[in-house]
Amino acid sequence: VTPLAANADTILYGEARVSVDYIDNHIQGADPYWDVVDDGSKLGVKGTEDLGGGLSALYQWEFSVDMTEGGNFGGLNQKFSGLTGGFGTLTLGTQDTPYWKVLNVIDIWNSSKILNGSTYLGGSVTPETNVNGALSTLPNNVDYQTPIFNGFSAEAMLVLDSDEANTVLGSPNISNNVDIWSVNLKYNQGPYFAG
């Protein structure tokens, strides 16, 4: 049997996100400074395979790439596989949360220092716990996305027994090894978006 990825339509993609920042932490005795900063550059592959009967398999494998310092290859980026069809899309792995997918629409730097998990949560989660934002991308999850109906769609995710979620949110474990749940409802039609 040939592996799925070998037969699937595969796309190689990436994003180079680099900025020149003036940083002033407003700490007494610390001078402001200029720095070249990587704001979430990444490299990845994704693809689909038609399984027939309106059903397709899909996968995505994505890595962080530090464009300024070198190294830092890997990171907590999306790595998942699943099925999609008339029922919607069901995926398993490490993925962006539904919460993040709505907020990400307004953040061109994608989970960087300007809009991160601590900003969204009013400072209740420190950005030092996860450089990508506390609720942006988490492992060990099951995600379901509905089909799109006249611009409306919904998504729900369960994060199951995840060490990363425990590190970020302090062992939440809501019940039966469910660490976090995340949902969204979106409207996206032409130039209009709400979520």
Residue ranges and their predicted role:
Residues 2-9:
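Sec/Tat signal peptide C-region and signal peptidase I cleavage site
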Residues 9-21, 31-161, 186-190:
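Outer membrane beta-barrel
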Residues 25-30, 161-178:
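Solvent-exposed loop segments that connect transmembrane elements
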Residues 171-172, 176-195:
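Detector for outer-membrane/organellar transmembrane beta-barrel domains
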